[in-house]
Amino acid sequence: MTLGCSKNLVDTERLMARLESLGYCCAHDPEVATGEIAVINTCGFIGDAKEESINTILQFAERKTQGELKRLYVMGCLAERYRKDLEAEIPEVDKWFGKFDYLNLIEELKTPPQPSPQREGLQAGCQPRVLTTPRHYAYLKISEGCNRMCSYCAIPLITGRHTSVPMEELIREAEWMAGQGVKELNVIAQDLSSYGLDLYKRHQLPELINRLADIEGIGWIRLHYAYPTDFPYPILDVMRERENVCRYLDIALQHATDSMLSTMRRHITRAEQDRLLDTIRTKVPGICLRTTLLVGHPGETEADFRELCDWVEQQQFDRLGAFAYSEEDGTYAAKHYMDDIPEEVKQERVAEIMRIQQAISARKMASQVGKVLRVLTDRREGDYVIGRTEFDSPEVDCEVLITAPSTLGKGEIRIGEFYDIKIERAEEFDLFGKLWSKK
């Protein structure tokens, strides 16, 4: 099972492909992981994620003690950072693997089972990943690590310096995914903006996205986790000119006051952020901007927070998430600042930001009523088929609920297809509509 972000999920999918090439039957489902081997891919980003990871490991350790599992392995960010401590505290785990040595688990499984008849032709390297997402969308991880060293962030301490994946490898992987029926590529990295600087000594994100857009069968390409400093502006031309590159950008801005941006070591000012946002909106009309904010960082005054709230109202982001500061071992903030804001104040600030965003979202969603939007369908729930527009990423954004009684027939809406949907009503984070036509 996988905890944490979509970047972790890609690692799990790669491991599953290697295991299946040896004849193992893998299930990405904790309810199925009984009787044989369990592998937990952990997150170690913030306190809540670490707690979830440890609790999950303990649950599976108990299952092993009860005889429900033969072996238990743990990999990922938590194991990368705290392996020695965890080995002593949770001896039920057979072996721990970090962020970069997890494929050594293959060596640990000395005697693989005999391949089943359906798997006899499957050889190592035949497929790069076992896709655990719905077949019509997948994640393409284009780099590891981060060089930014923001004050609050432990990711560079876990994953190391930014390392781009060679472009040709990414193109081959994306072509393979398209051949599997993937229609939506969610391009992910801790820092999309830096792609190519290490390998090619220049920004190569625009070139990469242009080449991905040429792959037959890819209907949407979505960009996640751009960094505002040293932003690769030519990507905006690609987003405007290429029909299958979504007008959607996930760019984490974190705060809005100069004092907090400096304290957070973001290497950008509010004025520079505002100019960047203006340029993005001018170059890509109608773009959906998603951002993430961090509140309760040491030194955030009430005046800082009020200015942040005013800025959120001013900028009118289409999608927004807010998180409370969590002190992480080894970070600049943990070493140099006192965690001086009470937890209840942090949570109140998160709630207030989200109340502001809820009102913004309600207005923006209401403006879609009466429009016909292109929607990719994800799943069925009762008498609705649930889908998303180009402005919505899987699992984190808004959804479109399409009226679709569960009767078979000529007008049935299929999962994993594009349709034109007439929007009839809206709620704060959801749209409701009916079939207009199949794209």
How would you label these PLM feature ranges?
Residues 70-76, 81, 179-305, 313:
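Conserved SAM/AdoMet-binding glycine-rich loop
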Residues 333-439:
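Terminal RNA-binding accessory module
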